[in-house]
Amino acid sequence: MNEGEVVLTPEQIQTLRGYASRGDTYGGWRYLANLGDRYADNAAAIVGKDTNLNGLNLWMKKGVENLWDDTVGKKTRLEKFDRVALQHFSQYVDLINKNNGRLPNTSEIERSYYKAVTYHGVSSSAAIDLVINRSLPDMADGYWALGLGIEAERIHNEQAVNNPNGSERDNRKQLISALDKGFDGSFKEKHFTFLQSVMMDLTKLGVEYTIDGWQKIGGWGNGIINDLYKSVVKREWTGIFEIVNNNIKQGNEAFKNEINSLVHDMKAAGKEFGDDLNTQWNNLTQAAEIIYNDIVDNTSQGIEKGVKAIKELSEKMKNAASDLADGSAEKAKQVVEDLAQAAKEAYENAKSTAEKAAQAAREFFKGLPSFKDLAEKFRDLFPNPEGWIDDGHQCFAPWVKETKKRNGKYHVYDPLALDLDGDGIETVATKGFSGSLFDHNRDGIRTATGWVAADDGLLVRDLNGNGIIDNGAELFGDNTKLADGSFAKHGYAALAELDSNGDNIINAADAAFQTLRVWQDLNQDGISQANELRTLEELGIQSLDLAYKDVNKNLGNGNTLAQQGSYTKTDGTTAKMGDLLLAADNLHSRFKDKVELTAEQAKAANLAGIGRLRDLREAAALSGDLANMLKAYSAAETKEAQLALLDNLIHKWAETDSNWGKKSPMRLSTDWTQTANEGIALTPSQVAQLKKNALVSLSDKAKAAIDAARDRIAVLDAYTGQDSSTLYYMSEEDALNIVKVTNDTYDHLAKNIYQNLLFQTRLQPYLNQISFKMENDTFTLDFSGLVQAFNHVKETNPQKAFVDLAEMLAYGELRSWYEGRRLMADYVEEAKKAGKFEDYQKVLGQETVALLAKTSGTQADDILQNVGFGHNKNVSLYGNDGNDTLIGGAGNDYLEGGSGSDTYVFGKGFGQDTVYNYDYATGRKDIIRFTDGITADMLTFTREGNHLLIKAKDDSGQVTVQSYFQNDGSGAYRIDEIHFDNGKVLDVATVKELVQQSTDGSDRLYAYQSGNTLNGGLGDDYLYGADGDDLLNGDAGNDSIYSGNGNDTLNGGEGNDALYGYNGNDALNGGEGNDHLNGEDGNDTLIGGAGNDYLEGGSGSDTYVFGKGFGQDTVYNYDYATGRKDIIRFTDGITADMLTFTREGNHLLIKAKDGSGQVTVQSYFQNDGSGAYRIDEIHFDNGKVLDVATVKELVQQSTDGSDRLYAYQSGNTLNGGLGDDYLYGADGDDLLNGDAGNDSIYSGNGNDTLDGGEGNDALYGYNGNDALNGGEGNDHLNGEDGNDTLIGGAGNDYLEGGSGSDTYVFGKGFGQDTVYNYDYATGRKDIIRFTDGITADMLTFTREGNHLLIKAKDDSGQVTVQSYFQNDGSGAYRIDEIHFDNGKVLDVATVKELVQQSTDGSDRLYAYQSGSTLNGGLGDDYLYGADGDDLLNGDAGNDSIYSGNGNDTLDGGEGNDALYGYNGNDALNGGEGNDHLNGEDGNDTLIGGAGNDYLEGGSGSDTYVFGKGFGQDTVYNYDYATGRKDIIRFTDGITADMLTFTREGNHLLIKAKDGSGQVTVQSYFQNDGSGAYRIDEIHFDNGKVLDVATVKKLVQQSTDGSDRLYAYQSGNTLNGGLGDDYLYGADGDDLLNGDAGNDSIYSGNGNDTLNGGEGNDALYGYNGNDVLNGGEGNDHLNGEDGNDTLIGGAGNDYLEGGSGSDTYVFGKGFGQDTVYNYHVDKNSDTMHFKGFKAADVHFIRSGSDLVLSASEQDNVRISGFFYGENHRVDTFVFDDAAISNPDFAKYINAGNNLVQSMSVFGSNTAATGGNVDANTQSVQQPLLVTPSA
């Protein structure tokens, strides 16, 4: 590579490809330019955005754009330039890649650009002509003139150099050289310097460059100077003259006619106003305010600034002219001087004009105290409020289209026109009021029309001689009346009447020739002026040829050339003449005559005329009905009142149409009439369809709809100028569609008229409350009176105030009336609280509500605010285009202004708002405005990232301006000014200063690009540097400090700080506290200071500095770069002998011997200290330096303590010595001696020897063939990979061989060792080797689970080989061979046989997968089956036998055994003893044998077998599977009659009648015997079988003893019979009879009947409505839930009703009963005395009880009756009366009155049958009622 040559790396090329993929050519070229590519520097300027460029770069870009425009045209440039640029850039990157990183040469660049240009559709010749394909490399080479496009064809070689045979490029370069010499040898240098200064001045002026400015200066003749002008001066000084000239033009235009310019500018901007100006008044006032402010700015600042700059520019131009000129460039000098003088004069003139206009404006506005006065001042400046017509134009479009289609005809205007400029007859479209209006059809109304362009003319004849072309009669076309009284078919037919000699030519020979004129409508207004009417002679026209052809050529813009002929000029040439069909727009119309109005009439509300209707005010002057209606409408005070009158107003205006009265019958017709100016709008097929459907009839519904629409059709005809006398339809659907379009259009019309009259009528009184102020030359509006006016109305009519304010805001666009929107929000909130909001919204209508709730603006100047009409309190507002005002209001809002000069308004309680203000346009001015008295001192200004945060100090709100500080506040997101309610304004510079001020809190401070000093002060601060050299002081607090691109100094100060360097050579000082320092790029210095710090140098040569008391610090020094030199430097007298150096993992630990600190250098020893984390040198304060090699030696030295020693890759011997040490091998063959202590030794990748020595050691092999010797102690050895030898030594050791063929060595006294030998590899051979004379007969071999136990018979040791028998000894855990010291070897098969031999002790024997017979013999043995069919005999002892997966036979033998089947169909025989049998899965057979056994079948169809003497056995048969069949089989002659079948709970009990045994089937009766526990069948030895149903019947049979009988769910009758029985009901309605005996009867869930019968019985109801009858005896009855009936019967009974409405029944001889009637529900309980009258019963209080006594033998005690209502009986029923709770409640509450009044019942008289005396009866009478039947 040559010196200075740029060569890119693959990574840099990949970065360039990223720019290409994103389409960012500017960024890509800038990236290349920064790498040193000169060509890229110029290319970036060519493709960059104007906003990215300035001075010379912008000049070059404009020059290149000129070249494109000159060569292929501006349109092609705009379409293809960016695509060509992107492809060229991509190809340029490909060339770099192809050249292995070298930059392309000039020829490669030219070919690349040529390919890019032609690829995108530019012709090859044009691509060659585009000097741009050579200009880019020329710029790179320094040939600036070629780069700006001196095209070859414009340079005469002989005038430059005498080299006609030279190449084009050489000649051009020589020309430049000659020019350079010709201009004093310094032309290029001076030119560059001068041009840059000029461009800077123009930039200061804020002007933009134009392309053709210099073309206004005339040519200089021929020769090199002319070429120089065209190619150089034009290109380089492009636009200077035009800039100056345009400014003059704009200034004059803005200030001409003084205040009248205000009106013109507003109209030019598209503002439309009415005579009264009360319509859209806000547009007027806002425009006036803006223009006035512009005037003031131009006079006080703008003009002075501009003149000063242009004067300086003029002087520079003069000086430059002198410097640049000598004899050959005199012309250039003169041009420059002329330009300078012109600029000076232009700006002096502009200044003078502006000052005069400003003064006039001041005087004008000072005299305007109110809006009303302003309106009067401007009344005569505006002819009509025409805007409403354009606003409503679209609403009429469907109607016009439909009527044209349905009346079958379209109308056009038909004049004759001449091509005057030779480029064909050109026309323009209709443009409403801004275009041509002409009275074609002679009705006195000028309507909008397509028109002939200004460079062509209409053939006309002034018939009445008034010098004006009045109407279509004076054109030649379909409105020309012929001699016979008819109208001409077209223009040629009209002209033919003037051919007096019949030669088919109109010339001087024809009498009328001299009367013909050509109207060239120069101003395109449709009104002929004298200078626009020219004779044929003046235009050199000799004759007009009447011959023509029908061409029907579409001219665009809705116009058609119908016929075309020609005319002849006096020079003999011909030109085109044609008959046009011009588009007609009847909507935009103006009456030609004017109605004079009285002063009173002139005050009426007004709308511009439309269609065939005059202006509303004029029409009212001619119609009394309309005038009265307009007056009434204007006087209506509410929206409802105006809407009620609106239809009538619309009709009365329509009735002033001269055509009114012609109804619009909708009828079917096939008779078509076509005149010269009408065409048929239907196709032939449609006409045929019409004829086919000629008899289409309409339904009554359709006819009714048509009748209702007739009147509206007439109205719309008047407003649109249409004629819908006959409308055609082809179906009922067509007819109904006409009705729909009619109604929709009418509704739109009504809405439009309503809205446009709003501010002239109902809302006008409010507007009159607005006043004007002039303060300090500032024009403002005062709305205070307007707020008062609305609040005054609200006091008496809240709905009117609400609706009026809403419509003023929706349609008035009061941009600066912020109070109005807040007032609306208040009204909304009040309406919502009052429940009126929905009603008010209905009055307003959907459109108005939508406008007030809208969140997105348009291209116009919009006002957006959430005033409560939206669904959400938090809204997002989008201004889009235009100068918008966005007011978030309450809530947390998102405001995005879009393009234009936008204003964001915030008042009190503005919430948590966000402003997104992206707008890259120049000249825009975006503002945040605080109102409601908010001033700057009430807010704080802070920065977060690039966002500006403006917070209210009282926490009432915050505004976040996103990306405000992009480009240091000069970017596209900035807010240009922040305005406060006291008039104070903050510009960007002031805001930037504010956000750098610190507080005592947690601040975020940001430096700018120029470099700053930031002080965090108190608090936990964030400080951010930028591109300059910054000083960032965190001061107190836990600070975060971020460097920028400069060489920054970061001081953390006090606290736990985080310091981050960046690209420069930074100095980071953490100060006090535990700090984090990160230098990142650059050669940084990091000083942690006091505290425990983390230091990260990043890339570059970094220095870490540690002084006294440096703390517990960590250094992370990752840097893979070559050539860097990182240093740790100890200061404050610290020397190496004051420190210790140790290693932990890859970390280096440098500790102070006095314990005052430690530095941990992370990963220092990666790659043995040669990796990316190393510290290259450690420096001490005495000058001593340690390099990496020295440090490596230091850290391998052991001590008497616990050391960590590491080998290096070359192989080492490490001795741990005393202490619990950690030794680590590396890649070499290491010898690692732990020596004394509990050591941990780790092998590396070599073949290492690890010796634990004394102590409990852990030895870990690694990849090599290692030798591990644990030595004394309980050691852990892990060989890992490789063929390792493991010697546990003395102690209880754990040996793990790992992968490879490993050998485990055991000698005398080997202890209790464990071998874990997992290795799934094939081909490995693992061995246990016994030494020291140990032979096989000295050991025993047993199995426990899958483990192999090898025990010394003398108990001196045991080796457990874990999982040896996995997969029957063929698994990954096996030991392949066991070697003994006598040479004997045991393989796996031999070992497997040894461990199946039983002893007289307790053995564990395991079957193998192939099937085995195991005999336990004596002892309590464990036998385990496997996958085969095994025979497992427990023999004597209490054995545990486990089946495997096969069909196994398990025999317990003697003893209490446990037998467990598994997956197969197993046979389990318990034998003698109390055994537990579990069949688990499969169809098993279970035989308990003698003893009391527990049998559990598990899943499958199981059989339980019982023979003689089977004992007390239990069957647990849970199995929920369907299809299973479980059986109990009795053998040995046992039959059913030898057994009893009873039920206990859900269990089935099968008992031998001789008492020899019992089988309990647990839960048999779950779900009435259909559950998962059932036995499906019981088989007997005589062949009899009992199914479940039979068993269920057997267990319900009673005996003479004490039975337990259970009902089933379906409902049963159970009879207990003799004995003390237990009867249980179920869910059905059961009858439960206890019969004789003391029975216990329990109801179920049904409505049960319980009869105790004889004896002392206990009856318990449950959930249903039960009947409980105790019968004879002393019974206990409890009804529990339900409405129960309790009958105690004979005896002394205890009755407890429970919950529900219960009835207690007592008959004669019921005995001494007790009722406990406690309840918490509201049910009613009754006590019924059958056979008793009320007088027979005594009521006696006994404590808290009530006793009802019929005799000494018969009485009832109601327990706790007087405790309260919960204990009472509600009603007492007797044979002759009933006493209810309401009757006696009042006596109870009165104390003892009840008992006193009833005490007679307790008298002896009553008891002996005496009568009740009269007094007692009188008290008792109210309590007695006749019982209900």
Swiss-Prot record:
Q: GO CC annotation: what is one?
A: extracellular region
Task: Indicate whether Membrane appears among the record's keywords.
Answer: yes
Chief location bin? membrane
Which GO molecular function terms does the record list?
calcium ion binding; metal ion binding; toxin activity
Q: Which PROSITE patterns match?
A: HEMOLYSIN_CALCIUM
Membrane topology note:
Peripheral membrane protein
**Superkingdom assignment:** Bacteria
Query: Where is it located?
Result: Cell outer membrane; Secreted
What InterPro entries does its record include? Haemolys_ca-bd, Hemolysin-typ_Ca-bd_CS, Hemolysn_Ca-bd, RTX_toxin/Mannuronan_C5-epim, RTX_toxin_determinant-A, Serralysin-like_metalloprot_C, TSP_type-3_rpt
Listed A to Z, the keywords are: Calcium, Cell outer membrane, Membrane, Repeat, Secreted, Toxin, Virulence
Ranges: Hemolysin-type calcium-binding repeats = 869-886, 887-904, 1015-1032, 1033-1050, 1051-1068, 1069-1086, 1087-1104, 1215-1232, 1233-1250, 1251-1268, 1269-1286, 1287-1304, 1415-1432, 1433-1450, 1451-1468, 1469-1486, 1487-1504, 1615-1632, 1633-1650, 1651-1668, 1669-1686, 1687-1704
Any one Pfam family match given in the protein's UniProt record, by short name: HCBP_related
Swiss-Prot/TrEMBL domain comment: The Gly-rich region is probably involved in binding calcium, which is required for target cell-binding or cytolytic activity.
Q: What does this protein do?
A: May participate in the pathogenesis of meningococcal disease.
What family does the database annotate? Belongs to the RTX prokaryotic toxin (TC 1.C.11) family.
- Return the protein name: Iron-regulated protein FrpC
Q: Which gene encodes it?
A: frpC
